[in-house]
Amino acid sequence: MIRISDAAQAHFAKLLANQEEGTQIRVFVINPGTPNAECGVSYCPPDAVEATDTALKFDLLTAYVDELSAPYLEDAEIDFVTDQLGSQLTLKAPNAKMRKVADDAPLMERVEYVLQSQINPQLAGHGGRVSLMEITDEGYAILQFGGGCNGCSMVDVTLKEGIEKQLLNEFPELKGVRDLTEHQRGEHSYY
């Protein structure tokens, strides 16, 4: 479910040494399954453990996850990274905003999942997003861009070199992607 690197475990163990005996950590998601989902880590004293929690035992600590957050923390990773600028704890939870779909789910659901969990977070940096409108009988994913992507002069490159390559790599049954958007250049456009 959650992978916690050795460096992150050592960091948590150091912090936990200053807490009440038996205190561990809790990993959670606020507003799971929504675009506003946020992940967090907090102290979890012994009296805060619920019967419905999942206990994930690691070498140096135990991480508790509440029942509601658990499916959204699938494939999550916590690391403690040190570079020239200092150290920071990172928590990556690719399924926090949308629950992972099964490998045998319909193609439309699997493509939508990749768009929402992998592609849209990248486009969001430019204020953009992409939506799956349909998959044609011929195997083309019909997409619509919004936000900063609408009217952006780089949208063709994003579509062909970024999105299409990634989707065709993950879904060989697709023939390609097409853009349905009526692009209108304006102040909202990124480039």
Curated annotation (Swiss-Prot):
Transmembrane segments: none annotated. Homodimer. One of its GO terms (molecular function) is 4 iron, 4 sulfur cluster binding. Pfam families: Fe-S_biosyn, NifU. Keywords: 4Fe-4S, Iron, Iron-sulfur, Metal-binding. The gene is nfuA. Its cofactor is [4Fe-4S] cluster. Involved in iron-sulfur cluster biogenesis. Binds a 4Fe-4S cluster, can transfer this cluster to apoproteins, and thereby intervenes in the maturation of Fe/S proteins. Could also act as a scaffold/chaperone for damaged Fe/S proteins. The lineage of its organism: Bacteria, Pseudomonadati, Pseudomonadota, Gammaproteobacteria, Enterobacterales. Belongs to the NfuA family. This is Fe/S biogenesis protein NfuA. Binds 1 [4Fe-4S] cluster per subunit. The cluster is presumably bound at the interface of two monomers.
